[in-house]
Amino acid sequence: MARILDNNVMGNEEFSDRTLRPQYLHEYIGQDKVKEQFAIFIEAAKRRDESLDHVLLFGPPGLGKTTMAFVIANELGVNLKQTSGPAVEKAGDLVAILNELEPGDILFIDEIHRMPMSVEEVLYSAMEDFYIDIMIGAGDTSRSIHLDLPPFTLIGATTRAGMLSNPLRARFGITGHMEYYQEKDLTEIVERTATIFEIKIDHEAARKLACRSRGTPRIANRLLKRVRDYAQIIGDGIITAQITDRALTMLDVDREGLDYIDQKILRTMIEMYQGGPVGLGTLSVNIAEERNTVEEMYEPYLIQKGFLMRTRTGRVATQKAYRHLGYPYQNT
């Protein structure tokens, strides 16, 4: 069953994301440090009439990496061609894409860490010197063809920057670390989305939604839609603070943005293992979730909010976790 707090794209959200996508830096809410840097780099590239250096955007899902890539293209006034690491299966696939680029174009590769190594190696000379050498044929009849490329900008997006190879990472001249959003920025995003979709919501309700959205605009917009449904059926269609509280309680999203699975992880650690340390494999078995799912989907937010610690001997529930769930804390 899909989690409403999953920060990956669900259902038709890709279309919804495009509808809500800001076009320029001044419309982009949050990520102020990244925006400030890109405003300078983009303007400098435009004044020199050069392509922008290659860009690596990294951070958790749902924080606007794809949106930022489109914003950069709009600010530069150039075309953007989009693909993803898993979609580029063979070196020939990438060569075909590169061969279609016009001078100054942006090639955006989402999930770039998932590209096969054989494909990644084609990028090295393309990024550094704007050419590729490709082999045609096989065996004794094989030959190398040199193909010059126009100057272009590669924007790579990843949720797993540590999985990038050193040679690929070194070829990005600009990096942008997308961080979890502050409450005030998420509140503004909720209110902007409500305006676009003609949803009536008061400021306190928007703030409550922001507080429980795990620092992620995609989750905030998803929760807004579900609370809108609740307000339409249970209330008079207007989203108030009270309606928001009731709807999120129905959705099992508590005041800290934890859902039933997050709470199950913490309760299991406290009730069965005295708060830990407990190994990831043991914890995964007890809550009937895959090890990678726990590590990649649930743990990051619990750690970021201070409910969970990773230690050399295992996971440990913090005093904040005990207090939040109403357990007496025993420091062992």
UniProtKB/Swiss-Prot annotation:
This is Holliday junction branch migration complex subunit RuvB. The RuvA-RuvB-RuvC complex processes Holliday junction (HJ) DNA during genetic recombination and DNA repair, while the RuvA-RuvB complex plays an important role in the rescue of blocked DNA replication forks via replication fork reversal (RFR). RuvA specifically binds to HJ cruciform DNA, conferring on it an open structure. The RuvB hexamer acts as an ATP-dependent pump, pulling dsDNA into and through the RuvAB complex. RuvB forms 2 homohexamers on either side of HJ DNA bound by 1 or 2 RuvA tetramers; 4 subunits per hexamer contact DNA at a time. Keywords: ATP-binding, Cytoplasm, DNA damage, DNA recombination, DNA repair, DNA-binding, Hydrolase, Nucleotide-binding. Residues 255-332 are annotated as: Head domain (RuvB-H). HAMAP family: DNA_HJ_migration_RuvB. DNA binds at residues 291, 310, 312, 315. Belongs to the RuvB family. GO terms for cellular component: cytoplasm; Holliday junction resolvase complex. The gene is ruvB. InterPro entries: AAA+_ATPase, AAA_lid_4, DNA_helicase_Holl-junc_RuvB, P-loop_NTPase, RuvB-like_N, RuvB_C, WH-like_DNA-bd_sf, WH_DNA-bd_sf. It holds the Pfam family RuvB_N. Mg(2+) binds at residue 66. It comes from Streptococcus pyogenes serotype M1. It catalyses: ATP + H2O = ADP + phosphate + H(+). Its EC number is 3.6.4.-.
